[in-house]
């Protein structure tokens, strides 16, 4: 009885915490950073601020609030849903360099009823698609005018697809099933969107989703958990993105081949990213830390952005691994903007790259998102494990002990 009383008290306390965190104001976070005379703006825009008129666009309105990562029984909303952008200030105006959608896992994993959990996962996936459409203003306008629009999304899960420690294997299954249910071949789906007059309007979209999962924590990269399961999803998604011939020297097919056939301005960058991804895949470099834990995940999101698809990425909570992915993307995007070259997979940032990374880690909005979700700022990716061999390469990548500690913050004191 004492154990049961403790369990009930803990659950009641947690529910109260969730209610408190959800009902805080969830507002857009904007930070600027300067490097080599260039000014960049990082913006994290929460679902509550995804508006065409005065209200947010979602049928189940957020009303200025949010859904924190601890709200694991919510079947109406995606957890921790934000649009993340980085822009450069050029010729008196801001030019968007990257825009994507970040969120928690598409699985209300503490819901016991499997049918209800599946319905919840599909509702969450629809919200991510709605946010993805919002991130493409021209496409959104066409959809609101009655056109059935094609929406390409590259989803990059960052979970460890194994149930050995925790339930992330089941969560990955829930997420993949939700994406599959929305993307049967030729399937049109109807989304309800609140238009500028505040009325719910049905829009028609034909979603195409390349759904990846790439484990990035110590369990995956040091102990090998979940790699085989993840790669069974990844090979299919790579075929969608790059065509059936995944040899590094092969001409890209799939979505990338279609994009390159138009001889776009970014032809070279797209080609290099495609080649890097195929090199990583061929040599299983994404199975090891190798100096860069997010090497595959980050390049998939960048490639999606370059070919005008919507990149979306998530871990379980949408704050720690998701936040580190956000920072790695922005580091590489700013480096590319400065040097016009892409870093090789597995390379540690050089001195300038480390400076950019340090500035991004402190000024990307990720510490604020952690605080919004838990009441405390800090990223749990930053760990000091014993034995030392289990540590990921983050101290080397950041290159400054004080900044590493600042980013780690109080995360080790926070559960899940």
Swiss-Prot record:
Residues in the signal sequence: none
Q: What's any one GO cellular component for it? A: extracellular region
Q: Where in or outside the cell is it found?
A: Secreted
First-tier enzyme category under EC: hydrolase
Determine if Secreted is one of this entry's keywords.
yes
Q: Which domain of life is it from?
A: Bacteria
GO molecular function term, any single one: phosphatase activity
Placement of sequence motif CX5R motif: 315-321
InterPro entries linked:
IpgD/SopB
Give the disulfide map.
Answer: none
Relate the protein's function as given in its record: Converts phosphatidylinositol 3,4,5-trisphosphate (PtdIns 3,4,5-P3) to PtdIns 3-P and prevents the transition of PtdIns 3-P to PtdIns 3,5-P2. It is one of the known effectors injected by Salmonella into the host cell and is required for invasion and for an efficient generation and maintenance of Salmonella-containing vacuole (SVC). Alteration of the phosphoinositide composition of the plasma membrane causes membrane ruffling and actin cytoskeleton rearrangements.
Notes concerning its domains? Contains the consensus sequence Cys-X(5)-Arg characteristic of Mg-independent phosphatases.
The UniProt family comment states: Belongs to the phosphatase IpgD/SopB family.
The molecule here is called Inositol phosphate phosphatase SopB
Q: Which organism is it from?
A: Salmonella diarizonae
- Mind giving the lineage of the organism this protein is from? Bacteria, Pseudomonadati, Pseudomonadota, Gammaproteobacteria, Enterobacterales
Its gene? sopB
